């Protein structure tokens, strides 16, 4: 996929506080990218800079290799769906969705071509006239002068006829107000159908549920066919079931429309469910960029491991390639490239730990708590060094002494940042 957007060394300062710290990010065409992080990490600020609602303190924003920092928000090929949707309460569903189209000049391309055709005509005419007058300055016979003048007049006549023919053809392509209204009607109904809102055209915004309002906001943003759609936590006000339904719908819309989506959230489930690429942020810095699978299975540091999914985080020491020491034992692992005796952070996911009979595992402990989570049990096992959180489908008795075990590939070793 071709790179569409490049953010280069972006910084942003608010009230002497550094909000963004040298952000570098590439976003490709038709990609679903999510900025994931806690409140105040700078993700919405990036969205606002890209949308043209804020300027960076330093750095560059390139769109198709050209800077757009001096391009007004309404002139960028980018639309935004805000957290509060920003719908017009005095307009019904149809008019909310049609709003952007009513501001659009449907004949703008034709007008541009008319102007371009006129410019070409004037330039070519001026060049012919210049050549003609240069010829006349030469020492010519009367017959030669007459011939040159005749040729010049024929060329001008042909050029003018071609120009007028093209202008007439272009003007015929212009659409009148009636045709424009018919096109708006067709486009609005098309997007209402895509968003599952057919039949609700005449309803007021107050008569819609939260999910329906969100669909209206997305339809209004999509109808102008932007190259990029920015979404600022649009699912945060929805109930769990509706949120899950909208996650699927948004991904389908993005895939079918070919529009690049940049989504902002603090919810890892939203990020993982929809995204091609996840950008994890904290304190105005990018912590890790990768696919949902990479972010979860190979977190770059302690923050990412803690923020994304539940984790058992442990401090340890690398003894050698494929050998790490923690909890008074040395374990086999699959990591290498660290210095010997280097202090490291270790993450073991709860679902990667198994509870086995005493004497058959790696570490011994006592079952301290059991919580039923619906699809699994969350069990805390207290060992001599720490408490491990484990997710299992097997029920275990409280206060029972057990062993826990895990495989070398379940131990993920990270540098300490």
Swiss-Prot record:
Q: Where is the ABC transporter domain?
A: 5-308
Q: Which GO terms describe its molecular function?
A: ABC-type polyamine transporter activity; ATP binding; ATP hydrolysis activity
Reactions catalysed according to its record: ATP + H2O + polyamine-[polyamine-binding protein]Side 1 = ADP + phosphate + polyamineSide 2 + [polyamine-binding protein]Side 1
Record's subcellular location = Cell membrane
**Which sites bind ATP?**
37-44
InterPro entries on file: AAA+_ATPase, ABC_SmlMolc_Importer, ABC_transporter-like_ATP-bd, ABC_transporter-like_CS, Mo/tungstate-bd_C_term_dom, NA-bd_OB-fold, P-loop_NTPase, Transp-assoc_OB_typ2
EC number(s)? Answer: 7.6.2.11
- Membrane-protein topology: Peripheral membrane protein
Give the protein's biological function. Part of the ABC transporter complex PotABCD involved in spermidine/putrescine import. Responsible for energy coupling to the transport system.
Quaternary arrangement and interactors, per the entry?
A: The complex is composed of two ATP-binding proteins (PotA), two transmembrane proteins (PotB and PotC) and a solute-binding protein (PotD).
Q: What is this protein called?
A: Spermidine/putrescine import ATP-binding protein PotA
């Amino acid at each position: 996929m071709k790179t569409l957007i490049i953010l280069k060394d972006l910084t942003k300062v608010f009230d002497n506080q550094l909000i963004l710290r040298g952000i570098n990010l590439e976003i490709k065409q038709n990609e679903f990218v999510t900025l994931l992080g806690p409140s105040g990490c700078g993700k919405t600020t990036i969205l606002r800079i890209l949308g043209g609602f804020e300027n960076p303190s330093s750095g560059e924003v390139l769109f198709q290799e050209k800077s757009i920092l001096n391009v007004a928000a309404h002139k960028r090929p980018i639309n935004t769906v805000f957290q509060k949707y920003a719908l017009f309460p005095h307009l019904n569903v149809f008019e909310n969705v049609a709003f952007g189209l009513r501001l659009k000049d449907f004949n703008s391309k034709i007008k541009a071509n008319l102007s371009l055709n006129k410019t070409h005509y004037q330039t070519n005419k001026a060049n012919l006239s210049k050549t003609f007058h240069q010829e006349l300055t030469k020492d010519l016979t009367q017959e030669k002068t007459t011939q040159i003048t005749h040729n010049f007049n024929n060329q001008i006549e042909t050029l003018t006829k071609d120009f007028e023919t093209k202008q007439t053809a272009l003007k015929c392509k212009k659409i009148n107000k009636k045709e424009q209204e018919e096109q708006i009607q067709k486009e609005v109904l098309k997007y209402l159908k895509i968003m599952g809102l057919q039949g609700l055209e005449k309803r007021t915004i107050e008569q819609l549920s939260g999910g329906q309002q969100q669909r209206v906001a997305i339809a209004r943003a999509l109808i102008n066919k932007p190259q990029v759609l920015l979404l600022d936590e649009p699912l945060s006000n929805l109930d769990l079931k509706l949120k899950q339904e909208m996650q699927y719908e948004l991904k389908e819309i993005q895939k079918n429309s070919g529009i690049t989506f940049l989504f902002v959230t603090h919810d890892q489930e939203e990020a993982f469910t929809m995204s091609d690429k996840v950008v994890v942020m904290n304190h105005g810095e990018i912590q890790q960029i990768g696919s949902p699978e990479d972010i979860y299975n190979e977190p770059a540091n302690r923050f990412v491991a803690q923020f994304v999914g539940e984790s058992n985080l442990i401090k340890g020491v690398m003894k050698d390639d494929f050998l790490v020491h923690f909890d008074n034992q040395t374990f086999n692992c699959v990591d290498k490239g660290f210095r010997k005796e280097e202090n490291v952070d270790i993450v073991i996911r709860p679902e990667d730990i198994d509870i086995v009979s005493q004497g058959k595992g790696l570490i011994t402990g006592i079952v301290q708590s059991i919580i039923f989570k619906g699809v699994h049990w969350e069990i805390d096992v207290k060992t001599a060094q720490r408490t491990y959180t484990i997710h299992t489908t097997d029920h275990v008795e409280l206060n029972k002494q057990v062993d826990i075990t895990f495989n070398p590939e379940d131990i993920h070793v990270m540098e300490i940042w």
